[in-house]
Regions:
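Long low-complexity, repeat-rich segments biased toward Pro/Ser/Thr/Ala that often serve as propeptides
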Residues: 67-70, 157
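Glycine-centered signal
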Residues: 73-74
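Metal- and O2-centered redox machinery and metal/ROS homeostasis
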Residues: 1-68, 77-143, 162-279
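Serine residues within intrinsically disordered or low-complexity segments
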Residues: 144-148
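Compositionally biased, low-complexity flexible segments
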Residues: 151-164
Length: 279
């Protein structure tokens, strides 16, 4: 748990401080003017993009456990919830499932940017993690799940084209996948990964709103504390869906909640030249 706390700490050098989770655009649009508005916004974040990230992170942590994740003590544990060949395909179809759940191109770009930065740091902190190595090398092939079918030309429908050799031609895996693999490397499980994803989804937005509006830090912290019960419940639901998705190799079981308001906010923010946060 101590290593997981390190991963969830905002001071962990993974670039998360540069992102507001659309809070900056929400402030610009007048959606957030005070603590009461912030609380409603955090609930929206947690129940949509937060829930999606939690499901993906939990699934990635389960996969990482099957791959062989090096814990904080350096010991490698082997698990067998999925067979070896399926384990090789999991990152590919999870990556596609993440793409399919982010309607805004700006959100996908921000997720991959944060994924790359977190992966760079996590590889230094947990160098013996095989799952992190797989993500770092992009060593995963064509996804083959009912919700991520493969076209006759070799591309995954709805998730972008594949590069030569059937490998995903993307610069970095999504943040939630790296978070799940890093959580497993830190000795945690799917629930820990889901909690970290959910807290990250609301924590970044809360911190950004505090800085942008000069809110009372104690009031903002109280908002986050009030969400603890909801975060625990959402994490449990994410683990249940992730476990079933991995067992059945069916990514459609993962949470897929979205918000058109957040998608549009993400796109508007990306087009702005003057801004404090990258997303």
């Amino acid at each position: 748990m101590t290593a997981l706390a390190l991963l969830a700490d905002s001071r962990f050098p993974s670039g998360g401080h540069a992102h507001s989770g659309s809070a900056e655009e929400a402030v610009s649009q007048g959606w957030i003017t005070g603590v009461a508005d912030l609380e409603r916004f955090l609930l929206l974040r947690m129940s949509t993009s937060g829930a999606v990230a939690a499901g993906l992170a939990a699934a990635a942590a389960i996969w990482a456990g099957a791959t062989g994740a090096t814990g904080a003590t350096g010991a490698t544990e082997e698990h067998d919830p999925i067979d070896r060949m399926a384990a090789c395909r999991v990152p590919g179809w999870l990556d596609c499932e993440a793409d399919a759940r982010m309607a805004a191109p700006a959100s996908r770009a921000a997720s991959r940017t944060q994924g790359r930065l977190l992966l760079h740091t996590a590889r230094r902190v947990w160098p013996r993690s095989r799952a992190l190595e797989v993500l770092d090398r992009g060593a995963f092939g064509v996804p083959s799940t009912p919700s991520s079918p493969v076209r006759p030309d070799g591309g995954a429908t709805g998730a972008g084209a594949l590069g030569a050799g059937g490998r995903l031609s993307r610069s970095a895996p999504h943040h939630s996948l790296v978070l799940g693999a890093a959580a497993a490397a830190a000795g945690s499980d799917g629930h820990g990964a889901a909690v970290a994803a959910l807290y990250g989804a609301v924590g970044a937005a809360a911190t950004a709103a505090l800085r942008l509006l000069g809110l009372d830090p104690m009031a903002v912290t109280s908002c986050l504390a009030a969400l603890c019960t909801e975060i625990d419940a959402a994490a449990a639901a994410a683990v249940a869906s992730a476990t079933m998705a991995i067992e059945r190799s069916d990514g459609s079981i993962l949470p897929s909640h979205g918000s058109i308001e957040l998608d549009l906010a993400s796109q508007r923010h990306a087009r702005k030249e003057m801004k404090l946060f990258a997303s």
